[in-house]
Each structure stands twice: as C-alpha cells, then as structure tokens.
C-alpha cells in the first residue's frame, strides 16, 4: 500500500475532512451503525467531521446478544446514544420467513426489506447525508448503488480513505473496544445468526450448526417446510441443491463469505416490500 494511504489510516480518527463530502442543505447527518467494526469506525469519523450526527441501528431481533455490550461500548466512544430502529410488524427473521413463505434467492431475502429497509426508510428525509461503513474493497458496489439511488446523499469515509475491515479491527483494539462475539467465533461479519444470504457456503452453515444449533435446526426445518434450499454443492460437474440437514458432519474448514446485509441489499429488497 502506498505510504500516503498508510498515513491516512494512521490519522483517520483525528481527521476532520471527508474527501468529497458536503453536508446536506437540511444539516442532518445520519450514520447507519450496523453493530459491525467498520460501521463503528465510519460513525466516529463522521462525528469528528460533521459534529452533530444522528446514529441509528436497525435491530433485527436475530443477532448475537453480545451486540448489546458492543453498542454500549461504542456509545461511550461516540459520546452519545445510538437510536434503535425496529420493525413494527416483525420481531425477528423467522417471523418474516414464515409470513412471506420464502427464504432467499439470487435476488435477495425478505428479511432485509422488512427488518432494515422499512425501519430505515421511516426515518429518512430528503436531503439527509447518510454515512455507511463500507470499506475500501466495496467501492464498485457503492458506485452502482449511487447510480440507482440518485436522490440519496451517501458518504463512505472508509472508502475515501482506503480503509479495510482489518484496519477497523485494529482501530477498535487501539481504543480498547472488544470486538463483537460473532467475529471471535470465526464469522466474517456480525450479521444475524444463520444469515440466509450465506448461500452456497457449507462451511458457514457448519459454523452456525457448531455454535448455534437451535438457530440452525430452525432454519433447516423451514427449508423443508418451504421446499427451498439455501445452498448448492458441485457433484459430477453439476450444481445440485442441498438441504441444511443433509450437510455432512464436521467442523468448518474454510473462511466465511463476505455476506452483505444493508445498504447494497436494499435495492434487491424492494421486490419483497
């Protein structure tokens, strides 16, 4: 990495300028805190850049209990509270799946729309500057989202500074904030336990089965009930569906996929609204 980029990372929390940013005419800045390391760092940068920032978190009712601790730690770091948004209709992902009779496809999952998009849209105002914690390797996805949502003003300070997720882990460690439990269990992202968007990832589901057997079994039963499979495996050169309860025994060996559930999933989620 270039020395200039390294320097940017070292001073990122002291910086008060977002590259190419501008406060919206209304003056309202909203940071979408997802309880992940990247969104925490992005929120802190936004606060030091803009001063007054409204921090919001969409509670899906299906994430790890340790997230409550992480939120409190981050609130102390931010020096202000996080506003929790919640669906008025559904308490968790399973209620969404059962009501919609659907889990996931290549076009997305209904849980994102109901538990994240709708609560977020209810507080959104035209002219808001929105802060998201997307990292340096996601710039192409941001460009696509901006093209399709030209009415929204988006700032991604981590992309502006070429900051990666690993950089964010290091920053939180330096300020004494313990990472969420899901990371420590080997999950790449701090998403819902048993995220159905982890498609074609047998190792991910082995990790869910190992640490969260109750959620694994509940999702497996829903697959059978709805006749929908989340995963496929390659056999004899062909991709074939496999139910969760058919996954062979054993511990996960590979790395989890980089599962996204937020800003870039929202356009897909529109079809389930």
Roles of regions detected by a PLM:
Residues 2-273:
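Nucleotide-activated chemistry modules centered on ATP-dependent adenylation/adenylyltransferase
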